[in-house]
């Protein structure tokens, strides 16, 4: 590291800004307790305490020795900031809260996050210069270009006018720094998303203690299609970092063994070109690419790569260095004036006057009372905790356990069919862990129309074409007696469900000793179009099915597949003590021992060709149109509008009389999955047969939030040898790794909105999981939920699942709405439970047959990136429809065969 260069660059920026000292006024503020409120939909409270000025022996850089006054200052202790206050500008990106988490750790307090069009310049000026609320500014990545005013918002004016405030721009923010000073923003040699490069730098303070150059260990993740043309840089902008080679790098931990490489050369027919892979990385056109700039006389820096990515090395060090730049900048300004200004500075920097800001933020925030922590058996003690309009419900849960008895009564399939399968299994549910290998899932939950607390919710978004309606939607509620009431939810379904869950009171002792997290509550689905309640302005298409359907279930049977145990649960009003329903369930289970397990109807075992599949199912899009849409996605990516777009389509087939439960039983055998599900909503003439391998989001009783996105899929091989080769091909695929990483960073962002600072982590990155028909690439992201965030806050922060949208999420969903010619409906949404104690577990609705009004539909698609081959994407989409479509056709074939024999 060139320390001289580091010192000189810091001095050059700071000293040139000393002339602006009169612009920025400082006043003496007495230390006092304060409350920091950050913006994460729910307000985040900072601990009340007096801010202290710590004294350290740190000396300002040696270039100050030339001045007698400054030399004297060198020998005096200087203040060290306990925390740094950052204004984080969000350019509608899906990685902003990864930056938020890093800054929260490094700065000692959370930054305030605002969208780039949320505050006027007058408001920004007020907080920056009149209230002196912030010490520095970070400008996030985002879709689009800095040349488009709607993409960049207020950021250009910040960069142009805030000459005396440290600013760090990331990706789009970096490009904006170049553009505002006259540099040209052009297309990169190639779009570069979710891939790694080695970086070399000039040793300036931003890269302090970070190695430089090829094989130095400084690997970074890049997400960009546009770059600053280095030839157009004005003299006031200094290049400080570049890609060190024209090569992409493999991810750490992903290695190609010699045996695999040798085998691939011998099996060219299997690998379809995989033999071309080698240890040498693919060359990038155009050579080195500019990766960082700084202003010669302002404390402004830009980074083209993403320091916040989970796969970037030294990312946290970069943010630490920016904090240090901020501290040194203000300390240097202080040292150029009178001693009394130093005292004023110390007080000013340490005690922000945040009251006006807090009031402004509070107007926008969604404040959630800390209701989740209430745990009492006394109803009277909790009446004041409910939301207005939602009466308090004190729930009592009782349960019994039948040890090692599931197999004795025919297993999960027989239990469900015998207890809930009569009368077409109407109004029944089965969250079915039909694939339990490698502990992917352990419990199955099932039930039907239950006791007095049972009800069914059905919600449809309002028709935005109705000019009298500005959002919300229509809810119908059927109770246990069949009575239906309807109401309009002005604030939408998520708000209603949130208030419902927060209105429950209970005693934790009721479920002590149970090894699972669902004890009764809501079970059902949330459709993809409810994205309209999660930040998307509107839906272009309207779903034929309800946008959400859930049961409130008060009687549940749980099967522990690991130990073969059965649990019966009954939920009732706390004012009663009835256990008759629980005893009835237990007796019905015991009676099953005398029954012969119900056999699945005989199914045809032959395979189906693509021609036969097409003859049964009609596609919403032709092969030609789907490939054209893939190319359109790649054009959007090239223009910087998205990093990755998850394009989907639907297959449909009209059905005659069909036993939907029998179809599901066939599907679960043909394609067992850990997050499978059966749902029937008879009032809606709707059945859902789901064989999903993917978890969307889970919140357990210990407040641990987990997502398990799948990105990367390949067919299983016909022989063990071929199967292993295909598995390794997926593991080493640069395209699939890039897809997966983009979604991992997106989910880290979503969890970061509602999780405790520093708790979001990735315990498993890009692992391969194998299922009946495919291998998949899966990652796991976890975090600790904040105490002031509710279960619905967590879902709303991450819905729809990023693996079904792409990134940045909001812009990607808008683009996909224009490319896709129908609503996704239930597909791409989620199925699962919301327990009355706020725990939940939700899947991603894929590999699913939706049967509605006599029509079967199957959705499928894939993530489109710059590396995608349009023809391969079409084939991958067909591959994902294979299992559910085959289940439908086999079931139809068995019906025809049975009719012919009569």
UniProtKB/Swiss-Prot annotation:
One of its GO terms (biological process) is tetrahydrofolate biosynthetic process. Residues 1-47 form a transit peptide. GO terms for molecular function: 4-amino-4-deoxychorismate synthase activity. Gene3D superfamilies: 3.40.50.880, Anthranilate synthase (3.60.120.10). Residues 415-889 are annotated as: PABB component. Expressed in leaves. It catalyses: chorismate + L-glutamine = 4-amino-4-deoxychorismate + L-glutamate. The active site is at 171 (nucleophile), 306, 308. It comes from the Eukaryota. One of its GO terms (cellular component) is cytoplasm. SUPFAM superfamilies: ADC synthase (SSF56322), Class I glutamine amidotransferase-like (SSF52317). Its EC number is 2.6.1.85. Residues 85-332 form the Glutamine amidotransferase type-1 domain. Pfam families: Anth_synt_I_N, Chorismate_bind, GATase. It is found in: Plastid, Chloroplast. Keywords: Chloroplast, Folate biosynthesis, Glutamine amidotransferase, Multifunctional enzyme, Plastid, Transferase, Transit peptide. Pathway: Cofactor biosynthesis; tetrahydrofolate biosynthesis; 4-aminobenzoate from chorismate: step 1/2; Antibiotic biosynthesis; candicidin biosynthesis. Bifunctional enzyme that catalyzes the biosynthesis of 4-amino-4-deoxychorismate (ADC) from chorismate and glutamine. In the first step, a glutamine amidotransferase generates ammonia that is channelled between the binding sites of glutamine and chorismate and used along with chorismate in the second step, catalyzed by aminodeoxychorismate synthase, to produce ADC. Required for the synthesis of 4-aminobenzoate (PABA), an important component in tetrahydrofolate biosynthesis. Does not possess ADC lyase activity. The PABA component provides the glutamine amidotransferase activity. In the C-terminal section; belongs to the anthranilate synthase component I family. This is Aminodeoxychorismate synthase, chloroplastic. The gene is ADCS.
């Amino acid at each position: 590291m060139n320390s001289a260069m580091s010192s000189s660059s810091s001095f050059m920026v700071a000293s040139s800004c000393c002339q602006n000292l009169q612009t920025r006024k400082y006043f003496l503020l007495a230390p006092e307790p304060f409350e920091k409120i950050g913006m994460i939909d729910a307000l985040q409270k900072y601990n009340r305490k007096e801010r202290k000025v710590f004294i350290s022996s740190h000396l300002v850089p040696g270039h100050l020795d030339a001045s007698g006054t400054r030399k004297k200052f060198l020998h005096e202790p200087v203040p060290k900031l306990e925390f740094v206050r950052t204004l984080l500008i969000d350019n509608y990106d899906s990685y902003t809260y990864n930056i938020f988490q890093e800054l929260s750790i490094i700065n000692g307090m959370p930054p305030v996050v605002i969208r780039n069009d949320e505050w006027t310049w007058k408001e920004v000026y007020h907080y920056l210069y009149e209230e002196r609320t912030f010490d520095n500014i970070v400008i996030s990545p985002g879709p689009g270009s800095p040349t488009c005013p709607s993409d960049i918002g207020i950021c250009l004016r910040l960069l142009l006018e805030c000459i005396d405030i440290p600013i760090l721009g990331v990706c789009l923010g970096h490009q904006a720094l170049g553009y505002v000073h006259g540099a040209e923003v052009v297309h990169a040699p190639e779009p570069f998303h979710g891939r790694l490069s080695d970086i070399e730098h000039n040793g300036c303070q931003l890269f302090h203690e970070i190695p430089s150059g090829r094989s130095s260990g400084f690997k970074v993740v890049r997400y960009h299609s546009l770059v600053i043309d280095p030839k157009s840089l004005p003299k006031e902008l200094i290049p400080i970092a570049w890609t060190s080679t024209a090569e992409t790098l493999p991810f750490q931990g992903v290695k190609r063994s010699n045996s695999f490489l040798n085998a691939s050369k011998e099996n060219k027919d299997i690998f379809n070109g995989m033999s071309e892979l080698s240890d040498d990385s693919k060359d990038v056109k155009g050579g080195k690419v500019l990766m960082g700039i700084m202003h010669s006389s302002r404390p402004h820096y830009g980074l083209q790569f993403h320091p916040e990515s989970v796969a970037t090395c030294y990312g946290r060090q970069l943010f630490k260095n920016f904090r240090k730049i901020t501290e040194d900048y203000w300390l240097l300004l202080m040292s150029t004036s009178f001693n009394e200004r130093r005292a004023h500075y110390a007080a000013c920097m340490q005690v922000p006057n945040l009251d006006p800001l807090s009031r402004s933020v509070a107007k926008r925030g969604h404040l959630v009372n800390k209701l989740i922590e209430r745990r009492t058996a006394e109803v009277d003690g909790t009446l004041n905790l409910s939301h207005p309009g939602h009466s308090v419900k004190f729930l009592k849960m009782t349960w019994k356990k039948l040890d090692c008895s599931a197999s004795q009564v025919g297993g999960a399939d027989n239990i469900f069919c015998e207890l809930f399968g009569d009368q077409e299994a109407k109004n029944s549910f089965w969250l079915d862990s039909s694939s339990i290998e490698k502990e992917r899932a352990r419990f199955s939950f099932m039930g039907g129309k239950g006791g007095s607390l049972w009800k069914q919710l059905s919600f449809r978004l309002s028709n935005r074409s109705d000019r009298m309606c500005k959002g919300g939607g229509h809810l119908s509620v059927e109770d246990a007696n069949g009575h239906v009431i309807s109401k309009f939810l002005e604030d939408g379904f998520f708000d209603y469900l949130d208030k419902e869950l927060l209105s429950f009171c209970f005693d934790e002792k009721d479920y002590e000793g149970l090894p699972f997290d669902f004890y009764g509550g809501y079970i059902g689905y949330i459709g993809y179009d409810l994205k309209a309640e999660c930040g998307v302005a509107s839906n272009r298409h309207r779903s034929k099915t309800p946008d959400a359907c859930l049961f409130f279930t008060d009687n549940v049977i749980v099967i522990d597949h690991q130990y073969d145990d059965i649990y019966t649960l009954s939920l009732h009003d706390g004012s009663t003590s009835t256990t008759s329903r629980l005893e009835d369930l237990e007796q019905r289970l015991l009676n099953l021992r005398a029954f012969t397990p119900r056999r699945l109807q005989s199914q045809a075992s032959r395979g189906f060709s693509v021609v036969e599949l097409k003859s049964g199912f009609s596609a919403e899009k032709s092969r030609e149109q789907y490939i054209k849409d893939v190319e359109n996605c790649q054009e959007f990516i090239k223009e910087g509008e998205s990093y990755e777009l998850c394009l989907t389509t639907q297959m449909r087939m009209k059905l005659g009389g069909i036993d939907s439960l029998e179809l599901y039983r066939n599907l679960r055998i043909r394609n067992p999955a850990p997050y499978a599900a059966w749902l029937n909503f008879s009032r809606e003439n709707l059945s859902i047969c789901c064989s999903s391998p993917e978890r969307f989001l889970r919140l357990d009783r210990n407040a641990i939030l987990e997502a398990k996105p799948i990105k990367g899929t390949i067919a299983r091989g016909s022989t063990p040898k071929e199967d292993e080769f295909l598995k390794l091909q997926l593991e080493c695929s640069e395209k699939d790794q890039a897809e997966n990483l983009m979604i991992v960073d997106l989910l880290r962002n979503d969890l970061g909105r509602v999780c405790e600072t520093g708790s979001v982590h990735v315990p498993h990155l890009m692992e391969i999981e194998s299922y009946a028909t495919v291998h998949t690439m899966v990652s796991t992201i976890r975090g600790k939920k904040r105490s002031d965030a509710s279960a619905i806050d967590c879902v709303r922060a991450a819905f729809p699942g990023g693996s079904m949208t792409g990134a940045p999420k909001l812009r990607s969903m808008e683009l996909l709405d224009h490319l896709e010619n129908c609503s996704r409906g239930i597909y791409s949404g989620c199925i699962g439970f919301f327990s009355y104690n706020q725990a939940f577990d939700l899947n991603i609705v894929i590999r699913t047959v939706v049967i509605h009004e006599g029509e079967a539909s199957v959705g499928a698609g894939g993530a489109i990136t710059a590396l995608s081959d349009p023809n391969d994407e079409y084939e991958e989409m067909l591959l994902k429809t294979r299992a559910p479509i085959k289940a439908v056709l086999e079931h139809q074939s068995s019906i025809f065969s049975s009719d012919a024999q009569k």
